[in-house]
């Protein structure tokens, strides 16, 4: 077995382990953040400052009975959370999380694969996760799950169009689909960040990413007041945990991608080293998603579609046209 294959396998294992652990810890952070905004304490009983709440929740999920409803399609019911997990982690393959570094005289590239269509690969594989809520809702033999599945189809497909069109303008400026090349394009300093050259693209992509991540205010797929838990209604135990671990993995992936594409990625930020800089940027966008959840109410499905097709899509197309004109001039 070649050294490249061994190195890639080790990277995959580290990536899955690290982001699985971060996904579990993010549940604690989010509960603490929401509690702060709502003037509560949040988790505080299990361990110091409630830090062991993550371990307690993990043990609970692993030991809960795995229930499959009568009349459900067992194979598809089991396959859906696996698709969610696989799409979340595979989409991370082209993301350069840190700058290259040397370990024991061997240069390490902290990404799985530097493919020349990395950004497109990230969006395409990540969007394959849409099949998870669709299949989960169809296989559950439950009307609330079915409604959540229908909402997933409408919402995720609609915003996939917007997010794809939105990234075209920044890619026209950079001239490459590689996330590594996009990062290097902004290496000149603070003013080279694409957020200053493409502010509209940043805002549109951020909103579209919240819709694709099923984050508030776009969490129509599992709106508790309307459809119980949506496509997850019949899930319990480990399968239920896999859905939400995939959701947090997607959140971390989008946070890193937004940091790389619009905010200089892992380039040094003044006196702050690049590796620490990208962690600060990605951490801010994870926190921002929690802040938005605590601040904004849910939107109705018709409001969501109106915003997508009547506002965001025309703005994305207008941004492409204006960017093309500026490049030609």
Curated annotation (Swiss-Prot):
Its placement in the membrane is given as: Multi-pass membrane protein
The family database entries (InterPro entries) matched by this protein are listed as: NADH_UbQ_OxRdtase_su1/FPO, NADH_UbQ_OxRdtase_su1_CS
Q: Which GO terms describe its molecular function?
A: oxidoreductase activity, acting on NAD(P)H, quinone or similar compound as acceptor; quinone binding
Q: Name one GO biological process term.
A: aerobic respiration
Q: What is its EC number?
A: 7.1.1.-
Q: Does the keyword Membrane apply?
A: yes
TM regions (residue ranges): 9-29, 42-62, 75-95, 117-137, 154-174, 188-208, 238-258, 269-291, 309-329
An example GO CC term for this entry is: respiratory chain complex I
Q: Which NCBIfam families match?
A: PRK06076.1-2 (NF004741)
Q: State what protein this is by name.
A: NADH-quinone oxidoreductase subunit H
Q: Which organism is it from?
A: Helicobacter pylori (strain ATCC 700392 / 26695)
Q: Which gene encodes it?
A: nuoH
């Amino acid at each position: 077995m070649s050294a490249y294959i061994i190195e890639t396998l080790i990277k995959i294992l580290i990536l899955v382990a690290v982001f699985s652990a971060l996904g579990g810890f993010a549940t604690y952070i989010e509960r603490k953040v929401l509690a702060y905004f709502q003037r509560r304490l949040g988790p505080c009983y299990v361990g110091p400052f409630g830090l062991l709440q993550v371990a307690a929740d993990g043990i609970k999920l692993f030991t809960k009975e795995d229930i499959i409803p009568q009349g459900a399609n067992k194979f598809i019911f089991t396959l859906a959370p696996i698709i969610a997990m696989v799409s979340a982690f595979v989409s991370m393959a082209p993301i350069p999380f840190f700058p290259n570094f040397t370990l024991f005289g061997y240069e390490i590239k902290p990404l799985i694969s530097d493919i020349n269509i990395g950004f497109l690969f990230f969006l395409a594989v990540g969007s394959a996760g849409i099949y998870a809520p669709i299949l989960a809702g169809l296989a559950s033999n439950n009307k609330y799950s079915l409604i959540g599945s229908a909402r997933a189809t409408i919402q995720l497909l609609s915003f996939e169009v917007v997010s794809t069109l939105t990234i075209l303008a920044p890619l026209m400026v950079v001239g490459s689909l590689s996330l590594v090349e996009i990062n290097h394009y902004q290496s000149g300093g603070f003013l080279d960040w694409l957020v200053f050259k493409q502010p509209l693209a940043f805002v549109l992509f951020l909103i579209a990413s919240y819709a694709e991540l099923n984050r508030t205010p776009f969490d129509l797929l599992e709106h508790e007041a309307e459809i119980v838990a949506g496509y997850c209604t019949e899930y319990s135990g480990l399968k239920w945990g896999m859905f939400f671990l995939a959701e947090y993995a997607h959140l971390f992936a989008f946070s890193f991608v937004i940091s790389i594409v619009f905010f200089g990625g892992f380039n040094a930020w003044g006196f702050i080293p690049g590796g620490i800089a990208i962690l600060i940027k990605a951490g801010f966008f994870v926190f921002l998603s929690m802040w938005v959840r605590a601040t904004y109410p849910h939107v109705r499905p018709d409001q969501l579609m109106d915003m997508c097709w009547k506002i965001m899509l025309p703005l994305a197309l207008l941004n492409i046209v204006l960017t093309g004109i500026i490049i030609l001039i």
